[in-house]
């Protein structure tokens, strides 16, 4: 099975707290992708320390191939029960998806994972195991392309309790929401931000608990090649373009000189597009065989600005609307954030004298800094 697991998470801090009591770890190994969500008891600094310890221990031991029993026993011996409330200092969920599609889900006292396939909720069978005095729910199943797996802390299912809702959002209501949203086939990034924003709305902007959403989406591998500057020596133009055209699903060319070079080598016409609505950026263009052709420095600078606004931990869900803009920068950002699993950059050392002095070294060029 040729797939990639896109993992994204979004957290809301308990109102009045600087630190989140939930912690997410994402681990990539040679054979699998591991997503860990830990929820520390309470909130603030104490909960943050407890969840960080739990998630780090799990992630490190799972990465090294330790058995589940050893991992849970290590956590139990490191973080004992609370002497007052007799509760575990931290709850956790672990999702490991192997590169052949086999999945292993382990849950301890966190809300059950939401598993969605083709817009419907699926419920993998699980077994209960007792390890080091803890009741663990464990599932083994096979994933498919397009599946979503959503891990949440209890702040999600209790969103709005006592405020907008008497008993909170509840697991079933969250499942209904995710089922409807998943039918739109959003990226993991969008789904995580949308669910987090919905929880924040139910809390009326003042979360009564740390609230974390971690989404894993199984997507096909997609290789994106981006060419942003021609070689310093024109003799290398053809070699660069030929390499750029190899083994890629999406091809992006940035810059007028780069576009002319690609069109010349491919012997295809370069056609400017008149369909754009953002006067602050130059219009895009078209070359047969190229997914997107844009202007260079201005467009790339705006692309970075959009990406920073979308991926920052404090970013709002409204920032994702920037990805739908009708301009080259928005299109590049959307491809990188939502369609790209492997990105290759083709950056030649030619300097455009219209942007800066050609006497300056390439390391100081605008594109190199971008």
Feature annotation, model-predicted:
Residues 240-266:
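Active-site beta-strand/loop microenvironment that shapes enzyme catalytic pockets
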Residues 25-27, 31-38, 141, 193-197, ...:
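Short, hydrophobic/aliphatic alpha-helical segments
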Residues 1-37:
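Juxtacatalytic helix/coil linker segments
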Residues 17-30, 123-162:
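Acidic loop->beta-strand submotif enriched in PP2C/PPM serine/threonine phosphatases
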Residues 30-43, 107, 142-165, 216, ...:
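Conserved beta-strand-loop-short alpha-helix elements that form
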Residues 20, 50-119, 136, 188-216:
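Catalytic core of PPM/PP2C metal-dependent serine/threonine phosphatase domains
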Residues 158-242, 246, 268-272, 276-356, ...:
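C-terminal catalytic subdomain
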Residues 23-76, 150, 162-172:
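Primarily the active-site beta-strand->alpha-helix module of PP2C/PPM metal-dependent phosphatases
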């Amino acid at each position: 099975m040729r797939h990639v697991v896109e993992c994204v998470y979004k957290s809301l801090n308990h109102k009045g707290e600087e630190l989140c009591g939930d912690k997410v770890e994402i681990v990539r190994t040679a054979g699998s992708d591991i997503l860990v969500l830990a929820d520390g008891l309470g909130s603030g600094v104490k909960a943050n320390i407890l969840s960080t310890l739990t998630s780090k221990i799990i992630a490190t031991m799972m990465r090294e191939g330790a058995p589940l029993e050893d991992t849970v026993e290590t956590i139990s011996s490191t973080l004992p029960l609370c002497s007052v409330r007799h509760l575990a200092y931290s709850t956790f969920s672990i999702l490991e998806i192997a590169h052949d599609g086999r999945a292993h889900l382990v849950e301890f006292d966190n809300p059950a994972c939401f598993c969605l396939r083709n817009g419907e909720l699926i419920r993998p069978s699980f077994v209960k195991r007792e390890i080091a005095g803890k009741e663990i729910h464990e599932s083994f199943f096979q994933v498919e392309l397009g599946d979503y797996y959503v891990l949440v802390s209890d702040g999600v299912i209790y969103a709005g309790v006592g405020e907008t809702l008497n008993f909170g959002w509840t697991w079933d209501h969250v499942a209904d929401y995710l089922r409807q949203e998943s039918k739109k086939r959003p990226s993991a990034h969008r789904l995580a931000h949308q669910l987090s924003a919905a929880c924040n709305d139910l809390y009326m902007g003042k979360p009564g608990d740390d609230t974390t959403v971690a989404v894993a989406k199984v997507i096909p591998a997609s290789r994106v090649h981006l060419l942003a500057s021609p070689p310093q020596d024109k003799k290398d133009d053809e070699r660069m373009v030929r390499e750029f055209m190899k083994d890629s699903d999406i091809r992006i060319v940035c810059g007028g000189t780069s576009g002319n070079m690609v069109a010349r080598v491919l012997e295809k016409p370069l056609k400017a597009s008149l369909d754009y609505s953002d006067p602050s950026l130059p219009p895009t263009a078209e070359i047969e065989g190229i997914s997107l052709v844009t202007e260079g420095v201005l467009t790339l600078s705006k692309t970075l600005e959009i990406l920073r606004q979308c991926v920052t931990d404090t970013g709002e869900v409204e920032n994702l609307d920037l990805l739908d803009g009708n301009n080259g920068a928005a299109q590049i950002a959307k491809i990188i954030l939502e369609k790209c699993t492997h990105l290759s950059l083709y950056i030649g050392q030619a300097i455009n004298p219209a942007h800066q002095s050609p006497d300056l070294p390439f390391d100081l060029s605008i594109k190199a800094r971008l």
